[in-house]
Regions:
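Conserved small-residue
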Residues: 49-160, 225
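Extracellular/periplasmic, surface-exposed regions of secreted and cell-surface proteins
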Residues: 1-94, 240-244
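Flexible, solvent-exposed coil segments and beta strand-coil junctions
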Residues: 16-26, 146-153, 227-238
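C-terminal extracellular loops and terminal segments
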Residues: 32, 77, 81-91, 96-99, ...
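Outer-membrane beta-barrel proteins
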Residues: 29-37, 151, 156-163, 195
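Extracytoplasmic gating/loop element in the C-terminal half of outer-membrane beta-barrel translocons
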Residues: 137, 188-244
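Extended hydrophobic-aromatic, low-complexity segments
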Residues: 10-15, 181-184, 192-195
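Transmembrane beta-strands of outer-membrane beta-barrel proteins
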Residues: 55-57, 170, 176, 181-183
């Protein structure tokens, strides 16, 4: 069977959105938020038997699109979430986007040389000369998304979504006389994940065991870094203090 659906939810209970000028008191929860979901579901069932054997298969495929319609009178109001004690908030919910999309910096490769560092100094760093710039060669280079020639908080953007492009499920049962075997498979395709574990395994911020990725896939001076996905090994590196789409 094939089904299409549309659902709009109104007056969701959310924290009131207002200017920081109103103070730091707790925000009251009010019935104000609206969102809509559209999607399509596909179901296929097959049953048959032969002699002492019988089998039953059920396949389910689902695709949906979630969109926030309103969380405040102001179109640019946002709700933040998924925070970590390292990099702060991870997700942003705002009008025109899905709930809790990942929000941070886009990684645009690595600083390959001193000139690149001087042309676009790293986020939060005061690089005055070539000597200062040397310390940042081989580290992540964030994208200047607003095109103003410098890296700052305004360069954060939507970098991924936890919502899958496709949800698939398969139930399978095979029976022989009084014996039966049942299996269930579930999969999501196209959704992004925030991997907090990599803070510990792929970077130097914490002591402890590290992944082999640090050894094999880190940027190395003078090497072929076409397959590198992690920055040069440096325990003073601050790139992981910011939420990004780094591998």
């Amino acid at each position: 069977g094939l089904e299409w659906y549309y659902k709009k939810t109104t007056d969701m209970l959310i924290a009131a959105q207002y200017s920081a000028l109103a103070g730091e008191s707790s925000k009251p929860y009010i019935n104000f938020g609206d969102m809509k979901n559209t999607g399509v579901d596909f179901n296929f069932n097959y049953r048959d038997s032969k002699g002492d054997w019988s089998w039953d298969f059920s396949l389910n495929l689902s695709h949906y699109k979630n969109e926030v319609v309103k969380i405040s009178e102001a179109d640019d109001a946002s709700m933040w979430g998924g925070g970590t004690r390292i990099s702060g908030n991870v997700t942003r919910t705002t009008k025109g986007h899905a709930i809790s999309e990942f929000y941070g910096y886009k990684v645009n490769g690595f600083y390959e040389n001193v000139d690149e560092v001087l042309a676009l100094p790293p986020l939060g760093q005061d690089v005055k000369n070539a000597e200062d710039a040397k310390a940042w060669v081989g580290k992540f280079k964030f994208a200047d998304t607003d095109g103003n020639g410098k890296l700052d908080g305004n360069d954060r953007t939507f970098i991924g979504s936890p919502h899958p492009d496709l949800i698939a499920g398969l139930n399978a049962t095979v029976t022989w006389k009084n014996w039966d075997l049942t299996a269930f498979f579930y999969s999501t395709i196209g959704n992004d994940l925030f991997n907090n574990t990599k803070y510990f395994t792929d970077f130097w911020l914490f002591e402890g065991n590290k992944s082999s990725r640090m050894r094999d896939l880190s940027w190395k001076p003078g090497a072929d870094n076409s397959k590198a996905v992690l920055p040069v090994l440096d325990y003073l590196d601050t790139c992981l203090l910011y939420t990004s789409d780094a591998a």
